[in-house]
């Protein structure tokens, strides 16, 4: 694989047109390129890189920044391909066949503690890849937060594939899908709820009550069960920061996080825990859970509690982003096809549900905490 330093060196000091390339660099470039052939066969690992990098244009008109960017694209695509191979192997062990990972245009900005890319896809309907769609509602779909809950991972990947397969169905809708928030836990044998540091990513968000309540809840309510360990401080884990990054960057109007095996829909957000006197905004936000339910064989909706450091607390309660937790009824991988048939209509309805809001300002008003536990909420 061409390394960044090699490309930059070639651009800055490369041979003049017609001059032979130094012998020690020649093996890095296909022979057909060196001969000036027009039908250059690009190796698999370079398929996403501009063909001109392999022709004579390599030494003509390409900037150092272009070369660095191309090298970075090669590196990222190679890491994504490696991850997809590992996911495919894990899928085969679960009798799921090949995953949808390698068929979709993932990207990543962070890696896990063990170096696995934290994948996401910013889907923008028929205008895929564009970011200038301010009128579009944005839905964030999360899977694999607790990877021992196997069925949500399958459902999240299949939903991403459905977006790709029928783009007209979701035209004018933006969906950001992160199907495997905790890859390290997924690749453990057996799969584990926590990440490699032993932290529950759904108890590690920097909620206002984290310093005062997270450890108390863990010790008293969970008897210090290591599967629910919230970490030594909030927002310490790559998987937690990854989810916060997605919320900051894409400003979602609604969030669907897929879990198992409790068997219900839980809503957190505007109007949660209110029995009457809801505003029209609160009513419309709460209706998101019931829309998903009606399109999923009337799956039951419960007003479940939220925990210190949880996504529902962080996004739904504190930042008023309508957040639905879809709890499948089993983690058994044999039910993956059943859950796809049952819940794809509900996920589709969630994306199409008209609800526009702005969270970006609230993201900057998150609670600030100190190691001593003092909390000061910015206005």
Where are the language model's segments positioned?
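Active-site/substrate-binding loop(s) of hydrolase catalytic cores
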Residues: 133-140, 150-276, 335
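Phosphate/oxyanion-binding active-site loops and adjacent basic polyanion-contact surfaces
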Residues: 112-114, 149-152
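N-terminal cap/lid segment of alpha/beta-hydrolase-fold proteins
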Residues: 104-115
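C-terminal accessory segments enriched in acidic
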Residues: 1-3, 13-91, 215-379
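Short glycine/proline-enriched loop/turn "hinge" motifs that connect secondary-structure elements
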Residues: 130-134, 209, 314-320
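A short loop-to-beta-strand scaffold at the N-terminal edge of the catalytic core in hydrolase folds
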Residues: 114-123
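Hydrophobic helical h-region of N-terminal Sec-dependent signal peptides
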Residues: 6-7
